[in-house]
Amino acid sequence: MYKRQAWGYARAADRLGVDIIQQCEVQGIETGPKGEVKAVSTNRGRIETKQLGVVAAGNSSVVLAMAGVRLPLETYPLQALVSEPVKEVFPCVAMSNTVHAYISQSDKGELVIGASTDQYVSYSQAGALHITSHTLEAVCELFPMFRRLRMLRNWAGSVDVTPDRSPIIGMTPVRGLYLNCGWGTGGFKATPGSGHVFAATIANDEPHTLVAPFNLDRFTNGRLIDEAAAAAVSH
């Protein structure tokens, strides 16, 4: 599901004239004498720009550090598992905050299973066996009929979490550098809306009214937006 939507966005952007460069790693952010964005250094060359939007999820802290900006983020591995394909038996998405697990079935028949974030800060992209075991125990407690299914693969991705569990969208102390991060595990669902207001923020060089409270300054002025209880999960 995620790959199909990502490719859909990519094709739509390509039709609008956007250049998408794959396997292009950002290695540095150059700033001018007044502290403004000047260029981006990558493993495929230097790109001059006066505006730079960073939407790097779990690696946002790494990228912003290149411009001298420290972010109030913690990055955790989040694991997912996929089972062998079976006929349609689960036409919905189930999530339990009691056992910290969720499960759905793809159109190929595979069960897609996930749980809470790992309990340690890491940029690891590999799944840990003890997390996998705990997740499967939780799913089988909810749905005993899945006990005989075999898992085909598992992996981990990085999610970025803020202290108040709300995203950061808007300006940074570096002129021309804009930030959209801190979504935890909710970023995919928020992509259409957050992309719209983030684009408006960059185009107008000022925060969109809907996301003005989600600025980076809230962590220094104390105007936090506590969403931990509303999310009911740690991420």
Locations of regions flagged by a protein language model:
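Mid-domain beta-loop-alpha active-site segment that forms a flexible
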Residues: 3-12, 57-59, 131-138, 187-190, ...
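Helical element adjacent to the flavin cofactor pocket in flavoenzyme catalytic cores
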Residues: 3-51
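Short-chain dehydrogenase/reductase
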Residues: 6, 64, 199
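Active-site catalytic microenvironments for nucleophilic, acid-base chemistry
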Residues: 12-16, 66, 201-205
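Hydrophobic/aromatic beta-strand patches that form the interior of the parallel beta-sheet core
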Residues: 21, 53, 178-180
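Active-site substrate-recognition segment that forms the wall
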Residues: 28-30, 36, 46-50, 54-175, ...
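C-terminal catalytic lobe of FAD-dependent flavoproteins
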Residues: 98, 140-235
